[in-house]
């Protein structure tokens, strides 16, 4: 229970080959560590929710991994509204800060840490941390509320975007959410009813809050994971969503899963269109892949040329560069 925040630009963990680029496999590998996990979509959210991570860890006494997509978000050059330290100061729980400082190692009030325990008491002590994790989501919500009040944002543990009466919904976290929003705007303007749930607080995963974010009209959900776990029944976020719905007694919603963006593979609007088109089928393909052509196991979804979903007046430029040439 040592408050700290590790800011992570999430990257690929080497498997059959080294890859230094972006996906979520390194973050998913940390699930058992007990770190809380907060996810962001773009540089502005990194600024805003990074503050939430620091404020929450001080009060909640649970360490945080605050993560965002490697390269796609971490290297994006973007204009943002930067925070001033005075903005943070007025939100900090100084009583919690002073209590944290008082727990520092000090010969005047020695404590025992890093002990070894046998089977007679280890299990009991391992469970003793439960109350801190149970209390943490409410603390995160509180500081998200403070940020919302200051900035006029609407950050929540799970944010829904799209038609209020959507019948098909994607669940994802990271930079794909901005792409999905453009596609959703286009599809809904064309008479479709689709939406997206953006996962903010990935750990602790609050099942009740996820269910509350899902419109009552939803019939099908596709969960998009940016990793691959060979041999598993599904990737981590997919399994979390399925478990959350089951634990809350939700039935009547078909849930499928898919993989995308491994090793910084691009996920353009055409991939998001393909995911929604797959959901519209009577029997959607499960455990699918996006953005590649899988001619070995046939798991990839076919992608078509898609309309331009960028806002009107957008000017697009492409720069070519390699390594350290300054591009």
Question: Where are the language model's segments positioned?
Answer:
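Short acidic, glycine/serine/threonine-rich loops at helix termini
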Residues: 15-21, 48-51, 75-82, 86, ...
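Conserved thiamine diphosphate
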Residues: 18-70, 94, 243-263
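Conformationally flexible catalytic loops at phosphate/diphosphate-handling active centers
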Residues: 64-159
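Glycine-/acidic-rich phosphate or pyrophosphate-binding loops and their flanking alpha/beta elements
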Residues: 145-168, 181, 301-316
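Redox- and metal-dependent alpha/beta enzyme cores, enriched for Fe-S-associated oxidoreductases
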Residues: 164-192, 205-212
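Peripheral docking tails and interdomain loops at the edges
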Residues: 220-310
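Conserved phosphate/anionic-ligand binding catalytic regions in large, soluble enzymes, centered on
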Residues: 316-327
């Amino acid at each position: 229970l040592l408050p700290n925040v590790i800011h992570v630009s999430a990257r690929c963990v080497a498997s059959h080959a080294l890859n230094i680029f972006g996906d979520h496999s390194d973050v998913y590998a940390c699930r058992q560590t007990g770190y809380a996990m907060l996810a962001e979509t773009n540089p502005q959210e990194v600024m805003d929710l990074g503050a939430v991570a620091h404020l929450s860890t001080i009060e909640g006494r649970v360490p945080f991994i605050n993560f965002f997509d490697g390269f796609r978000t971490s290297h994006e050059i973007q204009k943002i509204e930067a925070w001033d330290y005075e903005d943070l100061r007025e939100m900090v729980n100084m009583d919690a800060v002073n209590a944290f400082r008082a727990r520092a190692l000090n010969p005047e009030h020695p404590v025992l840490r890093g002990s070894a325990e046998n089977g007679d008491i280890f299990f009991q002590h391992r469970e003793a941390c439960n109350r801190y994790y149970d209390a943490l989501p409410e603390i995160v919500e509180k500081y998200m509320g403070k940020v919302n009040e200051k900035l006029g944002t609407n950050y929540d543990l799970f944010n829904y975007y799209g038609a209020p009466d959507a019948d098909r919904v994607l669940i994802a976290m990271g930079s794909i959410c901005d792409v999905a929003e453009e596609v959703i705007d286009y599809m809904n303007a064309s008479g479709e009813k689709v939406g997206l749930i953006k996962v903010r607080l990935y750990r602790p995963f609050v099942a009740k809050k996820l269910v509350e974010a899902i419109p009552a009209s939803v019939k099908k959900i596709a969960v998009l994971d940016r990793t691959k776990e060979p041999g598993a029944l599904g990737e981590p976020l997919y399994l979390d969503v399925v478990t959350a719905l089951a634990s809350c007694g939700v039935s009547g919603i078909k849930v499928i899963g898919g993989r995308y963006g491994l090793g910084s593979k691009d996920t353009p609007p055409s991939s998001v269109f393909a995911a929604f088109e797959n959901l519209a089928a009577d029997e959607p393909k499960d455990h699918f892949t996006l953005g590649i052509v899988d001619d070995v196991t046939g798991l990839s979804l076919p992608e078509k040329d898609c309309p331009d979903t960028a806002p009107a007046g957008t000017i697009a430029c492409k720069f070519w560069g390699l390594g350290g040439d300054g591009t």
